[in-house]
């Protein structure tokens, strides 16, 4: 008798700094996630149409599209996807306040972050009963 296959949770990481995106992807893979990294938010949006992720981790300040705009697109295209914003930029507060004023609330994690803190936050988001996105 075969044991049931446990589905890996899919996590998309979007950061315009390639080294950060790849590092987070590797950490998540080591922790058992199906992680995919993107430096272009539009590539992540396209990929989500093929495989909807369980979680989107995105930088906030990026040149092509900011992370809040990306998160709002994900909320429409992938309503079950949880979202974690990730930023080290001071300008983030204004963007977050603007999103809140438009009715969008997101979790925010400050860069740099220790991998243990990242994993703890991811577990809380993925296992919370209500949608945090």
Name what the model sees in each region.
Residues 1-10, 116-133:
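Non-catalytic signal-transmission and effector/linker regions of two-component phosphorelay proteins
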Residues 18-36, 103:
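Two-component/phosphorelay signaling modules centered on CheY-like receiver
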Residues 32-39, 47, 109:
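Short hydrophobic/Thr-rich beta-strand motif most characteristic of the beta2 strand and flanking loop
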Residues 39-43, 66-70:
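Acidic catalytic/metal-coordinating carboxylates
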Residues 51-57:
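Active-site beta3 strand of CheY-like receiver
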Residues 69, 90-109, 116, 120:
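Alpha4 helix (beta4-alpha4-beta5 surface) of REC/receiver domains from two-component response regulators
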């Amino acid at each position: 008798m075969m044991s049931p296959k446990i589905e890996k949770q899919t996590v998309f990481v979007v950061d315009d700094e390639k080294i950060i995106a790849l590092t987070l992807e590797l950490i998540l893979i080591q922790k058992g996630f199906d992680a995919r990294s993107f430096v272009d938010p539009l590539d992540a949006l396209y990929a989500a149409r093929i495989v909807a992720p369980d979680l989107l981790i995105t930088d906030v300040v990026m040149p092509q599209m900011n992370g809040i705009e990306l998160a709002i697109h994900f909320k429409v295209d992938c309503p079950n996807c949880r979202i974690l914003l990730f930023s080290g930029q001071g300008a983030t507060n204004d963007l977050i306040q603007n999103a809140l004023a438009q009715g969008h609330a997101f979790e925010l994690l400050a860069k740099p972050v220790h991998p243990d803190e990242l994993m703890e936050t991811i577990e809380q988001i993925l296992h919370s009963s209500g949608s945090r996105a």
